[in-house]
């Protein structure tokens, strides 16, 4: 066992040789390296697999032995200061290592086909491998300085990956936005690290926890300063994990390739903030104000993310806001003291969200030949629909990921989310009500995305899509209400030109006749090239892209079992609790792992009922075209209200839609207050500099010039004249001094 722990340093550095090899290959033999670029996938996957094998081995030993291991090397700078660096292996490290390596392997295999035609193929794999190295280095760090170093490397890799297609202005702006937003958190993290070093004199976790806890209990440190330092550490996690109010970078990060979105949203960047909170939780637990703040930020984020996901048209942005909401659940859990539930949901959500993002990549891959390669078209759910026939495997995997995120048993997220909901009732009923209500919203927006993508018929055919922003599909409301022909207006969904049918209309002017099915029986798209017509069909992805989806399906189905209690010698225990036993004992020495199955069943029925209600409402509004028309009278019986009641209902729907589609106006607020405010301040500073500062300096120079020009005519060039003037002035000064001195005496 000791031998295995000593060589755990291999885990973070295993993927690094691949990145270095690509760099050397492109530098020394660029032509050969580019010609053999598809062969580079194998070493990248192989090296990350080595790290995965080490991680699994360490995890098995920890489950059996329940030990924490730390190996350090001392670096002496001078006689008064030495820095120790090394690796820390505990349950949190092993969980994160397995998560990063397994998701990373799936994403790398998937990317081989997804990025095969991209000119930046090698650059993409180099960035991905270095990102895995940075994240693995972060989770194995033994002190705050190492964490900060790898924290910055993770941020740099995310910047490079988000802006991978840097020639696109939107991608360039997105990576800059992510970078600048995370600078706020990184600056706070650095100040917090320095503050705690000033308090405790140590960067090592165990020394830091013990010294700080003793100081707090003995009133040996100013509580306000300690709270401020802890808050600054938490600010770093808020920015990295896209928590309110530093969440604005997350939806724009979708400008990168889809495999990058899967990696960032599942196992790397957003997980880094959660990891930091989990790692430093012994610090936070002795400061009640910080624990309350963590839970409050988590609740705000989970509700805000869910509401912003309701009306998004971009499939990846919908999943991005879903990630934000689920990270709010994960952040809420440690804030209420539920350390186990936080890590459990981090695991289950990572695999489910990676499955959904890779599934969305398969969908986008099939839509691009039809609507074009612009993200505004290929990722727009308004143009999708009816893909079940052509993407059956992708559809099945996406459905399982959707149901898992909705919290439907026995899929993975059901077990973890239900545990967070149960624990939230013990902490605060208000937080619990918000969390449970958001679970219904989660089911609604996830099923909405699924139905718009796979159900019914290909929507592009109903809109006579022309590929321009003036196409009629922009006048269709996803809320079932006919809207104006503006991009930011209300968007309906199910209409047939020229007769429009609304779920909120007073009467149905036209019924769908039986010939409609014949007219749209073929889901092909007709494109004209040089007076020739070519038919393009949606198609299922290649096996290289489907294999990772199937692998993630297995995780989504079975990874929840690690947290299900089982009977072991008369006591109920689960693998995750046994895995986390040292950490749980460190945080809660008297923790009880017994399970009340009756209470669990009651709470599960309640949470599943909320999810089913959300699924039902989504199916009511976004079901297939045939079922929508067949049930139109039924739907209208609910939503058709006479006079002022209907107007009031429409206004509520418009407010919800505008709030969601415009991202809660938070981006507008930041743009107005910060971007425009800073530009206005810069213009004012420029004006003051040019008019005031430069005016004073230039004015003195001009005054000297004119004075010199005026007095140069006084002199005639005769020395006697200069002496006369000189003596005259001296005489005048002497007279003034004489009269002033004597007048002062007498």
Curated annotation (Swiss-Prot):
It holds the Pfam family Proton_antipo_C. One of its GO terms (molecular function) is quinone binding. GO terms for cellular component: chloroplast thylakoid membrane. It is an enzyme of class 7 (translocase). InterPro entries: NADH_UbQ_OxRdtase_chlpt_su5_C, NADHpl_OxRdtase_5_subgr, ND/Mrp_TM, NU5C-like, Proton_antipo_N. Its main location: plastid. Keywords: Chloroplast, Membrane, NAD, NADP, Plastid, Plastoquinone, Quinone, Thylakoid, Translocase, Transmembrane, Transmembrane helix, Transport. It catalyses: a plastoquinone + NADH + (n+1) H(+)(in) = a plastoquinol + NAD(+) + n H(+)(out); a plastoquinone + NADPH + (n+1) H(+)(in) = a plastoquinol + NADP(+) + n H(+)(out). It is found in: Plastid, Chloroplast thylakoid membrane. It is a multi-pass membrane protein. The chain crosses the membrane at residues 9-29, 40-60, 89-109, 122-139, 147-167, 185-205, 219-239, 258-278, 280-300, 327-347, 396-416, 425-445, 546-566, 605-625, 722-742. One of its GO terms (biological process) is electron transport coupled proton transport. Its EC number is 7.1.1.-. NDH is composed of at least 16 different subunits, 5 of which are encoded in the nucleus. NDH shuttles electrons from NAD(P)H:plastoquinone, via FMN and iron-sulfur (Fe-S) centers, to quinones in the photosynthetic chain and possibly in a chloroplast respiratory chain. The immediate electron acceptor for the enzyme in this species is believed to be plastoquinone. Couples the redox reaction to proton translocation, and thus conserves the redox energy in a proton gradient. Belongs to the complex I subunit 5 family. This is NAD(P)H-quinone oxidoreductase subunit 5, chloroplastic. It comes from Calycanthus floridus var. glaucus (Eastern sweetshrub).
């Amino acid at each position: 066992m000791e031998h295995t722990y000593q060589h755990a340093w291999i885990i973070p550095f295993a993927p690094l040789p691949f990145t270095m090899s690509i760099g050397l290959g492109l530098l020394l033999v660029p032509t050969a390296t580019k010609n053999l670029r598809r062969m580079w996938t194998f070493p990248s996957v192989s090296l990350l697999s080595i790290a995965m094998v080490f991680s699994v081995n360490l995890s098995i030993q920890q489950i059996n032995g329940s030990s924490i291991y730390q190996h350090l090397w001392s670096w002496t700078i001078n006689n008064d200061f030495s820095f120790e660096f090394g690796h820390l292996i505990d349950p949190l490290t092993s969980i994160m290592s397995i998560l990063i390596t397994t998701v990373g392997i799936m994403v790398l295999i998937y990317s081989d086909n997804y990025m095969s035609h991209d000119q930046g193929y090698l650059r993409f794999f180099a960035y991905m491998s270095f990102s895995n190295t940075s994240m693995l280095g972060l989770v194995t760090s033994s002190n705050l300085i190492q964490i900060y170093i790898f924290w910055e490397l993770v941020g740099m890799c995310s910047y490079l990956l988000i802006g991978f297609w840097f020639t696109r202005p939107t991608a360039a702006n997105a990576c800059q936005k992510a970078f600048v937003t995370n600078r706020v958190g990184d600056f706070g993290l650095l100040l917090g690290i320095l503050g705690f070093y000033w308090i405790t004199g140590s960067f090592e976790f165990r020394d830091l926890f013990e010294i700080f806890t003793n100081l707090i209990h003995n009133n040996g440190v100013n509580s306000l300063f300690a709270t401020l330092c802890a808050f600054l550490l938490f600010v770093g996690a808020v920015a990295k994990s896209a928590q309110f109010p530093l969440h604005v970078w997350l939806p724009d990060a979708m400008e990168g390739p889809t495999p990058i979105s899967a990696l960032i949203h599942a196992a790397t960047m957003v997980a880094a903030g959660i990891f930091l909170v989990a790692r430093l939780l012994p610090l936070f637990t002795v400061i009640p104000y910080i624990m309350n703040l963590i839970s409050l930020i988590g609740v705000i984020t989970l509700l805000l993310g869910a509401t912003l996901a309701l009306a998004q048209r971009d499939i990846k942005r919908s999943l991005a806001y879903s990630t934000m909401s689920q990270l709010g659940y994960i952040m809420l859990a440690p804030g209420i003291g539920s350390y186990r539930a936080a890590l459990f949901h981090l695991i289950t959500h990572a695999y489910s969200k990676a499955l959904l993002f890779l599934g969305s990549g398969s969908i986008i891959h099939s839509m691009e030949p039809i609507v074009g390669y612009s993200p505004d078209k290929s990722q727009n759910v308004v143009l999708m629909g009816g893909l079940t026939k052509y993407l059956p495997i992708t559809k099945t995997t996406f459905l399982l990921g959707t149901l898992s995120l909705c919290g439907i048993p026995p899929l993975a997220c059901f077990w973890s989310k239900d545990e967070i909901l149960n624990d939230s009732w013990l902490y605060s009923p208000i937080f619990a009500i918000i969390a449970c209500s958001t679970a219904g919203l989660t089911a609604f927006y996830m099923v909405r995305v699924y139905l718009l993508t796979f159900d019914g018929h290909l929507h592009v055919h109903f809109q006579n899509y022309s590929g321009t922003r003036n196409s009629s599909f922009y006048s269709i409301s996803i809320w079932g209400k006919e809207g104006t022909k503006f991009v930011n207006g209300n968007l309906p969904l199910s209409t047939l030109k020229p007769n429009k049918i609304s779920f909120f209309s007073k009467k149905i002017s036209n019924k769908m006749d039986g010939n409609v099915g014949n007219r749209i029986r073929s889901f092909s798209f007709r494109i004209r090239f040089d007076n020739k017509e070519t038919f393009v069909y949606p198609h299922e992805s290649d096996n290289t892209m489907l294999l990772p989806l199937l692998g993630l399906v297995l995780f989504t189905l079975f990874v929840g079992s690690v947290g299900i209690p089982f009977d072991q010698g008369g006591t109920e225990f689960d693998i995750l609790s046994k895995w986390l036993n040292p950490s749980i004992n460190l945080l809660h020495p008297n923790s009880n792992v017994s399970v009340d199955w009756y209470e669990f069943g009651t709470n599960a029925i309640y949470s599943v009922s909320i999810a089913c209600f959300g699924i039902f409402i989504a199916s009511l509004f976004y079901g297939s075209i045939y079922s929508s028309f067949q049930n139109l009278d039924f739907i209208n019986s609910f939503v058709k209200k006479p006079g002022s009641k209907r107007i009031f209902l429409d206004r509520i729907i418009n407010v919800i839609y505008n709030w969601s589609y415009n991202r809660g106006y938070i981006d507008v607020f930041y743009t107005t207050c910060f971007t425009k405010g800073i530009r206005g301040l810069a213009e004012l500073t420029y004006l003051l500099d040019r008019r005031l500062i430069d005016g004073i300096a230039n004015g003195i120079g001009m005054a000297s010039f004119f004075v010199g020009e005026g007095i140069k005519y006084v002199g005639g060039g005769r020395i006697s004249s200069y002496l006369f003037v000189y003596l005259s002035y001296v005489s005048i000064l002497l007279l003034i001094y004489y009269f002033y001195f004597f007048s002062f005496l007498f």
